[in-house]
Amino acid sequence: MSTFGATIAFSKTVDKEIAKHASSVFLDAVIAPDFDPDALEILKKNEALRIIKLITPYKTIRTMQEQEVHITPFGTLVQETDNKELDKDTFKVVSKTKPDAEMIEDMVFAWKIAKHVKTNAVVVAKDFKTLSIVGGQTSRIDAVETALDRACDGAKKAVIACDGFIPAIDSIQAAAQCRIGGIIQTGGTHKDKDVVDAANKYEIAMITTGIRHFKH
């Protein structure tokens, strides 16, 4: 994904430092609940930049839409909006290798992003930065391999987030070749034991969430 000509949305007030970073790349718009005066001064130097302040509270926006409607040549699909939140108290560390606090934060960060990517979705992240985002693949292994290829050398000790379960060990083997440190996925298939055993073999930390996103 490219930031060139993109729109950046923030869930918190944009301060001076954030504005400096945002103004260093070409953007079409910046959206946030509020802007510090210094931040506004910096952003307004770009006359072509659209600066949008949210009036409706962010939490309200997140819960406003209860259903999604998709119209196809074969009919209309109506489904509940995916408003599921990941609870750190309910996910399970299923591997022998345990993720440290920083890795868990990266896993949760990547998982939140994968939620909004078209399935099959895979996100590779490290240090609160996305290294690659891949979506719309027809198989999990294709999504994993493409994401790892885009992440390149940065994948070492990074984490992978999948929007659904990992159905086979081939994804674990691909992750091991790139020295991935941790994987967060839904879990819950009849091959879970094989997948966890493979993670243990390659000393990869694994978390299962019990939540499947599968954005269509």
Where are these regions (language model features)?
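ATP-dependent carboxylate/acyl-activation modules
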Residues: 1-216
